[in-house]
Regions:
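Active-site beta-strand-loop-beta-strand hairpin of nuclease catalytic cores
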Residues: 29-42
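Short, flexible loop segments at the rims of nucleotide/cofactor-binding pockets, characterized by
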Residues: 20-22, 44-51
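Flexible, charged surface loops at secondary-structure boundaries
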Residues: 10-11, 36, 62-63
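Short coil/turn segments at beta-strand junctions that form active-site/ligand-binding loops
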Residues: 13-15, 39, 66
Length: 138
């Protein structure tokens, strides 16, 4: 439910979101957000301290986004998260930006690749909703 509240915040900031987007590195980002200026944010969702400690794949995400955030519930202390990331405190109904993430502008080829991945994943998911039986693997 952290993802739902976070997506609501991102939409209020002018972003469209997609969950579980496969990245060129082979990893999957919890939430990827894209705005009309082409900015790409990745949000890694953490539900516990153990979740953060056990999962270090987020370090790979920075090369695929302009800004990297962690979203978590108010039960977790902010101090456990890396200092060079943004922090979003969320629940099932909404979220607020605790601190902004520093910007690391993507190179143009990476931005294009990520934008195309975002668009293709979104279109495929819509097509599966419209025609669930007519969608085999490409």
């Amino acid at each position: 439910m952290i993802a739902r509240g976070t997506a609501r915040l991102l939409r209020s900031l002018g972003f469209s979101c997609i969950s579980e987007l496969p990245l060129p590195s082979g990893r999957r980002a919890d939430l990827v957000a894209l705005n009309e200026r082409g900015e790409i944010w990745i949000v890694e969702i953490k539900s516990s301290i153990e979740d953060l400690r056990a999962d270090q794949k987020w370090q790979d995400y920075r090369m695929h986004c302009d800004r990297l955030f962690f979203a978590f519930t108010q039960d977790l202390p902010c101090e456990i998260f890396p200092a060079d990331t943004g922090l979003i405190v969320a629940d099932a109904y909404g979220a607020h930006m605790h601190c902004e993430a520093p910007e690391h502008r993507l190179p143009a080829p990476t931005r294009k690749l990520m934008t195309v991945r975002f668009a293709m994943a979104a279109a495929q998911r819509i097509n599966r909703l419209v025609d669930p039986q007519g969608h085999g693997e490409f």
